[in-house]
């Protein structure tokens, strides 16, 4: 039995050896022997079809007169697949979107692992960027969608969008700029109040349980700042569509940790009452530790600072590099600490390096090129070990720094581009539709638009309309 019905335009022998495929307007004639070397799941299903209905489940159309199978897919992506069949190498083209190319590979039944290493790294990096964009705090699609819905639900969505623009986007207008300026001012006032609360005279009054006008003024100042931060946190929670995602956001967790100490100390003071001094004394250390968390207010500046957001994004993306840096440091520390202890304690009779754990501190300080000078090797073997540890620290810490620097530059450029799109709503809408339009855009372009496929595949292409 033939793999598919006999057509008037094709011969049975030719059909048994070759298959003619039309992908997005470009025709290619493939040999089944090439598919045997690198099988495509969809074309293998095509060969196994026994009737016209089975063919239409695999391809989009079938031309009986030409014995030709039509697929309404991207011709640029399929050109790379033809290069795989001819040369045995699958490369990611620079023209099409990387995510659209991944979808094409899934359609034709090709494993992503067949990509060359450099192309696979590029694809994985693009997938990570897309995942981070989807998990971002602002949903650009919801922001840019026109609010024309009628009724209470439409008015609620419009109100949320306006509130989101004021709270999260300083470039949305005068209200957003004023809100950002007030928020930054309160952060600065909180930092100044935290510094003043550590002055010796105010700390002495706190320990004696007294409340001078200075102490009372600082308490009022802190109360006003906490009230503003609580109000801002409430506004951000109201404009969030998903409360669980809002509470899981890192900056919102920092806000909760910064606000919690004030309310805990206030509740303990109210619960203790006038005669509850013993309860306050027992909880004094805990309260002081909790109040130290007020320094987290400074992290709120990340909402309004592009550099701080870039730093946080870099730390999240370079978690593996930071772990590698820590591993290098620990291995070198475990190597040089016993050596300097042996050289100084046993040979030089120095008491500074009393034990190997005490030498760990010296090893860390030396490899990071800080050099406090509290522990200094005096003997010649100890100085040789010190020189080796310093040089090793410089080399080991330089390896991951290059990758971290490039990641920071890329993160800063991406966030700056997002900020510019947020400042102009119309370009933002066009940019948001770019990723979804890229896959369909490729179908309207010829294979020559990519211009970077393997030249060995050019001989397989035949233009439609002979």
Swiss-Prot record:
InterPro entries: BTB/POZ_dom, Ion_trans_dom, K_chnl_volt-dep_Kv, K_chnl_volt-dep_Kv6, SKP1/BTB/POZ_sf, T1-type_BTB, VG_K_chnl, Volt_channel_dom_sf. Highly expressed in heart, liver, skeletal muscle, kidney and pancreas. Detected at low levels in brain, lung and placenta. SMART domains: BTB (SM00225). Its main location: membrane. Residues 448-460 have a biased composition (Low complexity). GO terms for biological process: action potential; potassium ion transmembrane transport; protein homooligomerization; regulation of potassium ion transport. Residues 131-155, 416-466 are annotated as: Disordered. It comes from the Eukaryota. GO terms for cellular component: extracellular exosome; membrane; plasma membrane; voltage-gated potassium channel complex. The chain crosses the membrane at residues 175-196, 218-239, 251-271, 284-304, 320-341, 384-412. Residues 1-174, 240-250, 305-319, 413-466 are cytoplasmic. Keywords: Cell membrane, Ion channel, Ion transport, Membrane, Potassium, Potassium channel, Potassium transport, Transmembrane, Transmembrane helix, Transport, Voltage-gated channel. Residues 435-447 have a biased composition (Polar residues). GO terms for molecular function: potassium channel regulator activity; voltage-gated potassium channel activity. It is a multi-pass membrane protein. Pfam families: BTB_2, Ion_trans. Residues 197-217, 272-283, 342-356, 377-383 are extracellular. Residues 357-368, 369-376 dip into the membrane without crossing it. It is found in: Cell membrane. A motif (Selectivity filter) lies at residues 369-374. Regulatory alpha-subunit of the voltage-gated potassium (Kv) channel which, when coassembled with KCNB1, can modulate the kinetics and conductance-voltage relationship. Modulates channel activity by shifting the threshold and the half-maximal activation to more negative values. Potassium channel subunit that does not form functional channels by itself. Belongs to the potassium channel family. G (TC 1.A.1.2) subfamily. Kv6.2/KCNG2 sub-subfamily. Heterodimers with KCNB1 are highly sensitive to inhibition by tetraethylammonium (TEA) and propafenone. Heterodimer with KCNB1. PANTHER family: POTASSIUM VOLTAGE-GATED CHANNEL SUBFAMILY G MEMBER 2, VOLTAGE-GATED POTASSIUM CHANNEL. This is Voltage-gated potassium channel regulatory subunit KCNG2. The gene is KCNG2.
